[in-house]
Amino acid sequence: MTPAITAGLLHELVTHSHAEGITALDVEAVIEHDDRVLLIAEPGPDFTDDTWQLPAGPVLPGQTLTDALHPAVAAIGLTIDEITGYLGHHDHPGAHATTRVFCFTVTVTDPEAICRAAMHGHRWADPGDLPDPFHPAAWRWPATGPGGAARQ
């Protein structure tokens, strides 16, 4: 069971992160449709092989975690209908700072709009092929990962 998303929970998550010295925050969206999870192809470092990731984006100054989900999902041509749950977080150490990534489940108004947008490689992956849902950082594979080539 995922915790209810309340203003108190969102405030606590950010406050706890800042108390740990982590101020760079991102969000990820788990979007399910027809019992599959949406993964987006992102170019690898230095234009190496793509990796498969959940739709994600930064939390900008003045945004709540849930505010930041909307532009992250809109960037791939989808619109959030409802934010349905909070799954947890994971940290990404970087060269200058650690980024904390918060993972939420969402529903979207028209899941097939991603097909019409065609600006991103994507795939709808079987959740059984995915690692532990509480560690979405592990949901990144080379383009040869689960499901084969990107569906455009």
What are the residue ranges of the model-derived segments?
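NUDIX/MutT-family hydrolases
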Residues: 103-105, 113-147
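A generic structural micro-feature
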Residues: 19-23, 51, 95-100, 116-119
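Acidic/histidine-enriched, glycine/proline-rich intrinsically disordered or flexible terminal extensions
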Residues: 148-152
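Helix-adjacent hinge/juxtasegments
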Residues: 67-70, 74-78, 82, 87-90
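Acidic, metal-coordinating catalytic segment for phosphate/diphosphate chemistry
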Residues: 1-28
